[in-house]
């Protein structure tokens, strides 16, 4: 064990005594590596921005106090996320993967995943996959919008498998990191392809996050296609996440999307209010806050962040940190002080503003990758009629203006055409989960404060 690791292990022993089990397990244990520069700065690598920010905001002073206590030389600690780590030049490093740890965040478990109606099916199938890797659903494809728990559920599969079979070789990799590994190796030495393949193939379970990022990376897609087929034919478990159903992936080669669809696809939907409140209660219990957050406050926060659980949890952490810093009881006034800049009170207006209609049309066109003139125009190919009908439906849903007025926004279509389109979308959503997911995703984009 290196001196840096020894120092961190010593600090960990004190942290375990100072903080509760949840805080210790969630924040301090997941540190994956350490390295020290010539100026005595010891950089600690954690899995993501969330962990980095919490430690640096709330605990860094105590950690550096302990470092000074136990180090024989001047030293201070800094926490960074995995994405910030500057790697050694590719030519100087070996392509190695720690399969025992699998790049997994140990806090992402089935026990810490809050289950509700919106994710129940995905959760139960994930448990079956983890219990019988390679046998139940392969590939296992999880889709849903940003911040709804796809990564948590995917890594819970990996952690469960490792807990029950330490010999299993597991790898969690984000699609962009897979691309970077492949491109950087080839840019230095084209003969490294075999080494790349050998390392990625020597696993039992692969967890690939955000597969949609591979869009347009044709060479990487081809390499991933070869890897996919090899693992699949050898009964290795493949788990994939994406922000949309496989059938709606764009600029991904069809031979890949058809393989994704051949397994089991499950979606995680936007959780209902009661579910979001349960998530906040669980999060509050893990924060070691010693502060009471009332049901009314939790309900308010949950109502403001319907579409992104990470943002919702971030708001709760900000609120509790603010109250702790100023030694305040958490009231609605404190909520407004702490979260005012985050919330920016979104006032929804029903003004008949043509720009709002344009925005819906543009977002729908962008989502389905068709041009705005084709969306509004008279082309009858399904590629254009489906997004056109959805745009009509959403304008009616958001503004409840007359069908004739909506028709005027789509090349002067008549009342009955728009009425029929809206009824068809509403009817089809009840039977087609992929369509419902697409509409829900577009609604989220329309409501995003970044697009207002």
From Swiss-Prot:
Residues 73-102 are annotated as: Domain II. One of its GO terms (biological process) is regulation of DNA replication. Residues 1-73 are annotated as: Domain I, interacts with DnaA modulators. ATP binds at residues 147, 149-151. Its main location: cytoplasm. Residues 103-323 are annotated as: Domain III, AAA+ region. It is found in: Cytoplasm. GO terms for molecular function: ATP binding; ATP hydrolysis activity; DNA replication origin binding; lipid binding. Keywords: ATP-binding, Cytoplasm, DNA replication, DNA-binding, Lipid-binding, Nucleotide-binding. One of its GO terms (cellular component) is plasma membrane. Domain I is involved in oligomerization and binding regulators, domain II is flexibile and of varying length in different bacteria, domain III forms the AAA+ region, while domain IV binds dsDNA. Oligomerizes as a right-handed, spiral filament on DNA at oriC. NCBIfam families: DnaA. HAMAP family: DnaA_bact. This is Chromosomal replication initiator protein DnaA.
């Amino acid at each position: 064990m290196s001196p840096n690791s020894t120092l961190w292990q010593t600090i960990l022993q004190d942290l375990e005594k100072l903080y509760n089990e949840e805080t210790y397990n969630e924040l301090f244990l997941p540190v994956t590596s350490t390295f020290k520069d010539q100026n005595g700065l010891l950089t600690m690598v954690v899995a993501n921005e969330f962990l980095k920010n919490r430690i640096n905001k709330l605990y860094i002073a105590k950690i550096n106090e302990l470092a000074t206590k136990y180090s024989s030389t001047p030293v201070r600690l800094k926490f960074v996320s995995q994405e910030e780590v500057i790697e050694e030049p590719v030519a100087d490093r070996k392509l190695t993967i720690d399969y025992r740890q699998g790049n997994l965040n140990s806090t992402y478990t089935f026990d810490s995943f809050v289950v509700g109606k919106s994710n129940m099916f995905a959760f139960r199938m994930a448990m079956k996959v983890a219990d019988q890797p390679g046998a139940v659903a392969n590939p296992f494809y999880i889709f849903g919008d940003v911040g709804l728990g796809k990564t948590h559920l995917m890594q819970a599969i990996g952690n469960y498998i490792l807990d029950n079979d330490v010999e299993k070789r597991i790898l969690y990799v984000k699609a962009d990191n897979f691309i970077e590994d492949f491109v950087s190796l080839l840019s230095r030495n084209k003969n490294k392809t075999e080494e790349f393949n050998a390392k990625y193939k020597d696993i039992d379970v692969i967890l690939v996050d955000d597969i949609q990022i591979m869009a347009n990376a044709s060479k990487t897609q081809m390499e991933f296609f070869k890897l996919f087929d090899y693992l699949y034919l050898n009964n290795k478990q493949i788990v994939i996440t994406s922000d949309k159903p496989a059938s709606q992936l764009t600029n991904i080669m069809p031979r890949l999307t058809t393989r994704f669809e051949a397994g089991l696809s499950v979606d995680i939907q936007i959780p209902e209010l009661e579910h979001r409140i349960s998530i906040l209660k669980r999060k509050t219990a893990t924060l070691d806050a010693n502060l009471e957050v009332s049901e009314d406050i939790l309900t308010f926060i949950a109502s403001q962040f319907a579409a992104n659980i990470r943002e919702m949890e971030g708001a709760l952490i900000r609120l509790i940190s603010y109250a702790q810093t100023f030694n305040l009881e958490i009231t609605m006034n404190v909520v407004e002080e702490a979260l005012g800049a985050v919330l920016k009170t979104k006032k929804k207006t029903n003004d008949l503003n043509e720009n709002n209609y344009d925005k819906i049309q543009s977002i729908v066109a962008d989502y389905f990758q068709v041009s705005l003139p084709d969306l509004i125009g008279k082309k009858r190919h399904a590629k254009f009629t489906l997004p056109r009908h959805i745009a009509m439906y959403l304008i009616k849903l958001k503004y409840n203006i007359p069908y004739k007025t909506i028709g005027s926004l789509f090349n002067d279509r008549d009342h009955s055409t728009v009425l029929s389109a809206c009824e068809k979308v509403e009817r089809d959503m009840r039977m087609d989960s992929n369509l419902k997911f697409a509409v829900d995703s577009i609604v989220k984009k329309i409501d995003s404060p970044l697009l207002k």
